[in-house]
Amino acid sequence: MQKKILVAVDGSPPSRQAVDYAGRMNNLIQGLTVTLFHIQPPISQFLLDEAKRSGRAQAELNKIAARNAEASRGLLAGYRETLIRAGLAEQSVEPATRPHNQGLAKDILDYAQNGLFDAILVGRRGISAVQQMFMGSVSAHLIENSPVIPVWLVDGNVRSTRVMAAVDGSESALRAVDHMAFMLSGNPEVRFCFFHVTPRLKDYCEINFGAEAGGGLETLIAQGDQRCMDDFFPAALAKLREAGFREEQIETRTDTTLLSVGETILEAAREGGFGAIVMGRRGMNKSFFGGKVSYSVSHKLSDAALWLVP
């Protein structure tokens, strides 16, 4: 079965890292096809308006558009060669370019949805102190606004092909497992790790309730979480079995932490040598807590990929 990934690129180092990651995924994903997608630079609104009134301005506009398209095709040709050298068949790598229309993220999402892609892969920009709130706006907008298609966010050089699914018992986490099972189906060698962090009271509320009240609430949270995961794990394992995976390919880990849930997930991924973290974008009942965890992981990700499933 074909698995279609849209790799959104420009000429930046993060885009080159995203392309390299797509090449490595060819060894993990059976039936992988990649479309390299580049949005051309926007053209001045002044020139667009002038072109409606002046033939000379229209001629200049046509020249700029032609140069943009030519530069885009050259960029994509180089990335295509990278993927072919990585082992993808020529017919499995398609370049595509479009003029800038509504905005980078919106244009990428529209193309991905119209093309029925299984995932959008993008490199994450480095985050400076000033950029912290924006997280490299294109990747941030893709993550927040993709209604259906999972977004794969790559940071740095990802060498490992090991996959860890960070799960919290939510429907979003089950959709993430379903996505992971589909993308990796047909590979008898792949190994998964289900990783669950038992949440603490502080993960839901920063108010200090005192030792007695806080202890009772901690117990209630732990008991509720255990009941939830007792239902979740059989459902998740069933999805993997339906996709053809054997039980010996699957490992399950549960951890408690004094850190935040997001930091614990990242630490477990680093210590376990996992190259990809798979998780749902929202937690139980689309809670802020679940969204806060995925937000934290996406911001602090380093030399790894995050498969974030709506």
Named regions from a protein language model:
Residues M1, G78-I120, A238-I277:
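Structural beta-alpha unit
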Residues M1-N62, T161-A222, K239-F245, E251, ...:
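Small/aliphatic-rich secondary-structure junction motif
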Residues N27, Q113, E144-N145, R270, ...:
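Solvent-exposed polar/charged
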Residues A65, A69, R73-E81, Q226, ...:
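Short, surface-exposed alpha-helical segments at coil->helix boundaries
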Residues Q102, A119-H141, S160, R270, ...:
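Glycine-rich, Arg-bearing micro-motifs that act as flexible, cationic patches
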Residues M135-G156:
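Short, structured interface segments
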Residues I149-V151, S298-P310:
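Short, flexible loop segments at boundaries between secondary-structure elements
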